Amino acid sequence: IAFLAGDAAPRHFENPRQVPAFEYPADYGPRPPSFSRATLVESAERRQLFVSGTAAIRGHATIAVGDLPGQLACTRENLHIIAATAGAGADFGAADDWQRTLKVYIRHARDLAAVSRDLDDHLLRPGDIVTYLHADLCRSDLQVEIEAVLTKDV
């Protein structure tokens, strides 16, 4: 999203198992990034939860370096945690009729089938809209990153 405007102030959320990005140590660059893990926008018609790029990070460290299944498991867990923290449920909005749109960024094109199969088995449900993108990620030791928009009519 390049720009989002509305009448209500958005609410920002962090993952309690991750250091907020703006508190990252200098190991990751001269200035820490400035984003929240998720932002909830509510109106009279709908609730939208914008989940920032989520990957296999605990604290500020990359988890399961070189282990794609391990990174996928940690990434899925982080998605569940941030959704629960923001009020969309510990199941990443699955049980509460949230429409889910995901972008899945994959470092190595050869991993597409494995990533797709893992998400089909452990995260996705019928009706989810998913786009897989071959892309460079923010850290060289990350193999997959997922961002999402969860929308629920009220």
Can you name each region flagged by the protein language model?
Residues I1-V154:
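N-terminal presequence-like segments and the immediate start of the first folded domain
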